């Protein structure tokens, strides 16, 4: 048992406690928070390196093995998601250190708490602790969303809190039904229990599974539970919106993990997602694309791109093949980093335009227009999926993987239009921001510093994912193959206990 597995949770938790104790000094909080984020980078690479060998590491808290104790599980998929969260957190903190973090006393504590919750959700091996980590990251996100105050953020925060409280209640109901029927909430142990479940209890488990899927769909912003996202993400301050770019991926990860590890074990739950996931994914792509066309602010356009990415990812996952899941994982990394970078750039453009902000209206000439324009062009090409950047590679992989699916023509049309139509939106936006005649400059002069470094790091992600597309795609394929071979997961988590017949409720 290696302690490396728990470090992505412990380090940000310790940083959150330290920042809370230092709440009177923003400089001290910055040092602690940035130091923790920097210390996590080698941890991310170590997680990927350890998982790349194909083994599955189990961390049993307190020495209590599953299914009786709390376990963290590190496989290729968990390592990829935790590493992505860690890599995303650093530039978001860099941007916040430019001054946004000083608008509230608890920004860094809440930020680190959310990182801990995200990593815990990716690493946990049972559904109850998935719920716990969901609540940790959601509680932190409630505070982060209201950071900086403002009426729009208060309204967005209220919507966000109400929806997620409803989701949490539904999650608890599902857990109660599953525990009452199966006698366990460990994902590997649940799979073993499903194979022995009496026929009389199968309908109850399917109902609980449907509740779980509804909760995960809310987290992922799958239609019809996606209308909250553009309003909420568009209102958040830039570094918070950047970190929120991975929040929807938690729901997608949960769908992947639970369907592949748990529900795939029994015929009556194996098809729980298949009949409806592809139609809803296509509809989500369409709604996100229309939302981007209708938006009047760059930040809201980027938020709608996240909705589009959710639909694109779930369209691939609906196919449920190894190739499709591998394509989805590659595109997931791309879309998360590029969307986060675009949120930061939109805020930078808004600051440079003064009172005009990032609204699609004539404003003063941009200061640092060349640098902002270069970043805008790079991120626009990446987020639309145009060659030669990683968005094109990811979408091409997904299009290839969905061939032969029942709704393949509709999926192809939706994915291709979600690249073409947003490209027109971004071209129109560029003409407003960079080329339209304007009165004399009234925007602020932007200085190079932490925020610029953050944007450069995230803008560089797409070219790097293109250059290193082969090894990233190979890792994604290996993760997909491991996910579709859950027997190794069961053996690693349960060990000899997999063969023990435990008394269960009838």
Residue ranges and their predicted role:
Residues 1-6, 14-111, 188, 478, ...:
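Transmembrane helix-loop-helix hairpins at membrane boundaries of multipass inner-membrane proteins
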Residues 1-11, 74-86, 127-140, 205-218, ...:
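Structural signature of hydrophobic alpha-helical transmembrane segments
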Residues 27, 107-113, 117-204, 292-359:
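Alpha-helical multi-pass transmembrane bundles of energy-transducing inner-membrane proteins
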Residues 62-80, 193-209, 272-277, 404-410:
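Short aromatic-rich membrane-water interface segments that cap or initiate transmembrane helices
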Residues 63, 211-276, 303:
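Short helix-boundary/re-entrant hairpin motifs in multi-pass inner-membrane proteins
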Residues 144, 194, 233, 313-323, ...:
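Interfacial segments of multi-pass membrane proteins
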Residues 223, 332-356, 409-444:
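Predominantly late transmembrane helices and immediately cytosolic-facing juxtamembrane segments
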Residues 236, 355-359, 364-374, 426-506:
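Cytoplasmic/organellar membrane-interface segments at the starts of transmembrane helices
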């Amino acid at each position: 048992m290696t302690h490396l597995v728990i470090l992505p949770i412990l380090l940000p938790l310790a940083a959150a406690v330290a920042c809370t104790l230092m709440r009177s000094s923003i400089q001290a909080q910055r040092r602690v928070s940035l130091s923790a984020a920097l210390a996590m980078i080698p941890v991310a690479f170590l997680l990927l390196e350890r998982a790349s060998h194909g083994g599955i590491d189990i961390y049993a808290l307190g020495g209590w093995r599953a299914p009786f104790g709390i376990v963290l599980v590190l496989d290729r998929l968990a390592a990829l998601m935790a590493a992505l969260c860690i890599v995303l957190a650093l530039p978001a903190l860099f941007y916040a250190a430019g001054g946004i973090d000083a608008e509230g006393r608890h920004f860094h504590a809440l930020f680190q708490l959310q990182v801990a919750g995200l990593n815990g959700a990716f690493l946990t091996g049972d559904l109850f602790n998935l719920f716990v980590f969901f609540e940790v990251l959601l509680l932190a996100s409630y505070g982060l969303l209201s950071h900086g105050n403002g009426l729009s953020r208060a309204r967005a925060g209220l919507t966000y809190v109400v929806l997620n409280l409803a989701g949490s209640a539904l999650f608890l109901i599902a857990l109660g039904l599953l525990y009452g029927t199966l006698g366990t909430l460990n994902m590997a142990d649940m799979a073993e229990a499903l194979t022995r479940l009496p026929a009389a209890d199968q309908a109850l488990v399917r109902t609980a599974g449907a509740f779980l899927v509804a909760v995960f769909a809310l987290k992922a912003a799958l239609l019809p539970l996606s209308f909250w996202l553009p309003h909420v993400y568009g209102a958040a301050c830039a570094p918070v919106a950047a970190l929120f770019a991975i929040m929807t991926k938690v729901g997608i990860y949960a769908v992947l993990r639970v369907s592949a590890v748990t529900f795939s074990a029994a015929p009556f739950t194996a098809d729980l997602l298949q009949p409806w996931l592809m139609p809803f994914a296509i509809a989500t792509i369409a709604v996100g694309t229309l939302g981007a066309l209708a938006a009047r602010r760059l930040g809201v356009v980027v938020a709608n791109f996240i909705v589009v990415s959710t639909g694109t990812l779930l369209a691939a996952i609906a196919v449920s093949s190894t190739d499709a899941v591998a394509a989805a994982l590659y595109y997931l990394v791309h879309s998360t980093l590029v969307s986060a970078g675009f949120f930061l750039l939109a805020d930078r453009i808004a600051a440079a335009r003064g009172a005009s902000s990032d609204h699609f209206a004539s404003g003063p000439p941009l200061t640092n227009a060349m640098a902002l324009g270069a970043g805008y062009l790079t991120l626009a090409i990446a987020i639309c999926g145009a060659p030669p950047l990683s968005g094109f590679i990811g979408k091409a992989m997904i299009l290839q993987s969905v061939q032969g699916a029942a709704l393949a023509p509709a999926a192809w049309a939706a994915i291709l239009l979600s690249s073409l139509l947003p490209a027109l939106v971004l071209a129109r936006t560029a003409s407003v921001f960079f080329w339209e005649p304007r009165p004399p400059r009234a925007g602020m002069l932007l200085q190079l510093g932490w925020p610029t470094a953050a944007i450069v790091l995230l803008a560089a992600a797409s070219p790097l994912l293109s250059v290193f597309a082969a090894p990233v795609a190979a890792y994604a394929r290996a993760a997909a193959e491991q996910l579709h071979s859950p027997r190794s997961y069961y053996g690693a988590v349960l060990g000899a206990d997999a063969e023990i017949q435990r008394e269960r409720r009838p």
